[in-house]
């Protein structure tokens, strides 16, 4: 009888054991949507909103009273720790890519009028030359919590790296709470740690198939193991010239002119999302052959290209061990 009671008690404990469950929170931030899945019952929506508010106040060029807007107006201002992290990372990637990644090119991008009919309108070369005088992150220095610009017209825009940084901030928030299983996604930029406790498997994320008609579908699903992934596409924001050549919104940081490209999508896997985000942007402008050469000295970066060949057919290329599934 005693043995029967013990067996029944053990069976009762197993039957009462909670099934693994994730918490999923969604919302809007940085002009896009976000989705966060994590292994905890606690709702952190308010904490996320507070973190996003602080990041926007620091680096949003859409907010007139943000720190970066004040710096772009040449107002004396002390930057915060978020700005320091992103600025220093931008400096390093600017150096590594020999200026291809440059957060000061935004004014030139904005100056190009692509026109409502999808045709690249002419832009006076003198205006481009004038704008290019203020381009170059090497013209901007950080002195502790002060930003110093050699040219007062230099316009700083962290749009190509800040979204990935926001992903990392949420991830680090979880790790401070000892939450080790999570997936953070903001506008397609992703950071994954641990596993999906519901499925008891690695986090699966999709690589989107390019469509020029704005439809969405997944080309393939891959597993992320304590990594981050960012994707930069050229197939949604492009215009054509009079000869039918397609141009994306990529501006050559050396010339100030848009570049013709056959690249459609570039996905980069790195240890943190800020790094992946910045390199995905840079690799759009570098092109496949230059990226191949670059990756020889950067084994920490995994890259996946989707591009058009000479027959206007889609092709893919995986580099540095980008996962197949």
Where are these regions (language model features)?
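Mature catalytic core of soluble alpha/beta enzymes
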Residues: 16-325
């Amino acid at each position: 009888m005693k043995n029967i009671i013990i067996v029944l008690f053990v069976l009762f404990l197993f039957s009462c054991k909670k099934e693994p469950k994730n918490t999923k929170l969604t919302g809007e931030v940085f002009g896009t949507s976000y989705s966060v899945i994590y292994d905890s019952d606690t709702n952190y929506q308010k904490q996320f909103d507070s973190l996003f508010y602080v990041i926007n106040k620091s680096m949003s060029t859409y907010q007139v009273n943000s720190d970066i807007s004040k710096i772009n107006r040449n107002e004396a201002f002390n930057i915060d720790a978020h700005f320091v992290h992103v600025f220093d990372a931008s400096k390093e990637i600017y150096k590594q890519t020999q200026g291809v990644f440059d957060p000061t090119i935004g004014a030139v991008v904005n100056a190009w009028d692509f026109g409502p009919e999808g045709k690249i309108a002419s832009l006076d070369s003198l205006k481009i030359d004038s704008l290019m005088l203020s381009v170059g992150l090497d013209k901007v220095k950080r002195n502790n919590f002060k930003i110093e610009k050699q040219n007062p017209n230099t316009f700083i825009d962290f749009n190509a790296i800040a979204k990935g940084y926001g992903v990392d901030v949420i991830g680090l928030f979880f790790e401070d709470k000892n939450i080790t299983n999570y997936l953070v996604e903001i506008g397609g930029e992703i950071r994954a740690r641990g596993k999906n406790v519901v499925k008891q498997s690695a986090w699966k994320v999709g690589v989107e198939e390019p469509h020029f008609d704005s439809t969405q579908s997944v080309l393939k699903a891959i597993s992320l193991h304590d990594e981050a992934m960012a994707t930069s596409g050229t197939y949604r924001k492009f215009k054509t010239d009079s000869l039918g050549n397609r141009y994306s919104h990529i501006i050559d940081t050396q010339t100030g002119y848009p570049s013709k490209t056959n690249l459609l999508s570039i996905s980069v896997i790195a240890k943190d999302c800020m790094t992946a985000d910045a390199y995905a942007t840079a690799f759009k402008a570098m092109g496949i052959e230059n990226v191949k050469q670059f990756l020889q000295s950067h084994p920490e970066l995994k890259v996946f290209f989707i591009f058009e060949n000479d027959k206007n057919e889609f092709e893919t290329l995986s580099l540095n061990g980008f996962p197949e599934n």
